[in-house]
Amino acid sequence: LCNDLSNLLNRTISMVNKYFNGKVPKYNGTPNEVDKELEKYTIEQIEKFEDLMEEYEISNALQEIWNIITRTNKYIDVTAPWILAKQEETEKLESVIYHLVENLRKIAILIRPFMNETSNNILRQLGIELKEKNVWQTLKENNKQEEIKVIEKGEPIFMRLNMQEEIEYIKGKMG
């Protein structure tokens, strides 16, 4: 959780602040191939998630969410937003940042039934309010929200554990 989801959120918020002064770029409707691939993959995983939930295969459904998280982290590495910024490829950079925020919005909605507080925390940090009565309907489309402003400094949604402290704590409880 800490390495994947929390890191994805913090990296995204950091880039929105660094490259766009905290304002999420609007969707321009013309994604490049890498963006299209991410969109397609995300929708496929959401559909698998829905099918698995209907069959009460909760752990497998949760794995589909983590597949989206993993793929979105990989998307950062593939698109290299820091290079796009350095090369002043603003339109591509806007699309990358938009897609990162959009996938985090979808992830927050997907984890909501299992981790409601974490979902709310992610959405709050992204500056997103869920106004729709049925947010599930927005999962398979790009949400064209008006201006979104993220918080200035991302907050960890999960804290790293100190293994030695945890071992000592457990030993102390065991007597």
Question: Where in this protein do the model-derived segments appear?
Answer:
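Basic, alpha-helical terminal appendages of large translation-related enzymes
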Residues: 51, 55-57, 66-175
